[in-house]
Amino acid sequence: MVLDITGVEKQGIILFSESELSKEFLELIWIIVSILTTIVGVTLGVLVIVWLERKISAGIQQRIGPEYAGPLGIIQALADGIKLLLKEDVIPARGDIWLFNVGPAIVVIPVFLSYLVIPFGKHIILADLGIGVFFWIAVSSIAPLGLLMAGYGSNNKYSFLGGLRAAAQSISYEIPLALCVLSISLLSNSLSTVDIVDAQSKYGLLGWNLWRQPIGFLIFFISSLAECERLPFDPPEAEEELVAGYQTEYSGIKFGLFYVGSYLNLLVSSLFVTVLYLGGWDLSIPFLPTSNQLTWILTNGTFDIINAIIGIIITLTKAYLFLFVSIMTRWTLPRVRIDQLLDLGWKFLLPVALGNLLLTASFQILLLD
């Protein structure tokens, strides 16, 4: 007797293919939702930073600051953003239109890409790459090209000089920054941002790389401020010398991209300081149960949500503490000259960062022996 199972096989193949297609479709939807959620969250974070900076600077200068747009003026930054969107987009008549238009996008897009490898919790990360920290350094090195394009495409001497200064400054401080990241990677035996946080959480509060790499932390802090072009490291935008630097000819939404990009970069730097030196989402306070310890108490889906929320809150709290220090630095220290800035990067920070890397490597070799 011969059984005809051709129809059954076809039906099984069709059901299997449909299930695979639905699974791929759901994964695609999940990726899109995750990316959009990150973009919205980061944009809201920038609005909070702008409001905090205005309030803190007002307090330092004994002013009130924004107070009419919403409670305590909290939506003043949103109102300013809408105003920039509605402004006319002026293009220089004799400038290079293509370079002028593409420059702001090349500056902003790498900053958004940096958020892919930032962990806000144990499993809250868009892309857990094995070379996460190097990915951040690689994409951030693209931004100087956009600054040069913006300065050259404006057909303005002040813009061009500002673009040259910005590119030189970014290249100068990218190297000490990368050397500090290498030192952290040697201590953690990994280039993954998640593994770096896990390596710190093994030893609690005393395991933070802030205590194991104090010199590297100071170099990373100074270099990140210079990368973000924050005072006292903002010669590319020195008003007394270059009007507004490479932003001089920009208006409307393109100027808004530069404005948002600078704060996005500042938030990225603060988050990486948190991940690399301050233990990331790990709290590690004595006698206070952390998320890892609570896992033994609660094991249902509700705990996963609570754990994720706690991790996000801890990470953002540490990042905003670093932002507070950056804002205080901006409003209390004078601007340095461009020659002093480059000398600091090449003649002081680079040799010290190299020495710190050699000491870290020697220490790791001794441990292996």
Swiss-Prot record:
Q: What class of enzyme is it?
A: translocase
Lineage top rank: taxon: Eukaryota
Q: For this protein, what is any one GO molecular function term? A: oxidoreductase activity, acting on NAD(P)H, quinone or similar compound as acceptor
Kindly give the Pfam families that the UniProt entry links to this protein.
Answer: NADHdh
- Protein name (database record): NAD(P)H-quinone oxidoreductase subunit 1, chloroplastic
Quaternary arrangement and interactors, per the entry?
Answer: NDH is composed of at least 16 different subunits, 5 of which are encoded in the nucleus.
Record's keyword annotation contains NADP: yes
Q: Which cysteines are joined by disulfide bonds?
A: none
Q: What does this protein do?
A: NDH shuttles electrons from NAD(P)H:plastoquinone, via FMN and iron-sulfur (Fe-S) centers, to quinones in the photosynthetic chain and possibly in a chloroplast respiratory chain. The immediate electron acceptor for the enzyme in this species is believed to be plastoquinone. Couples the redox reaction to proton translocation, and thus conserves the redox energy in a proton gradient.
Natural source organism = Angiopteris evecta
Q: Where in the cell is it found?
A: Plastid, Chloroplast thylakoid membrane
- Tell me, in one coarse class, where this protein mainly resides: plastid
* GO biological process terms held by the UniProt record: aerobic respiration; photosynthesis, light reaction
Enzyme Commission number: 7.1.1.-
Listed InterPro entries: NADH_UbQ_OxRdtase_su1/FPO, NADH_UbQ_OxRdtase_su1_CS
Please report which protein family the annotation says this sequence is part of. Answer: Belongs to the complex I subunit 1 family.
According to UniProt, the reaction catalysed is: a plastoquinone + NADH + (n+1) H(+)(in) = a plastoquinol + NAD(+) + n H(+)(out); a plastoquinone + NADPH + (n+1) H(+)(in) = a plastoquinol + NADP(+) + n H(+)(out)
Q: How does it sit in the membrane?
A: Multi-pass membrane protein
Q: Where are the transmembrane segments?
A: 29-49, 97-117, 129-149, 167-187, 205-225, 255-275, 305-325, 348-368
Residues in a coiled coil are none
A cellular component term (GO) from this record? chloroplast thylakoid membrane
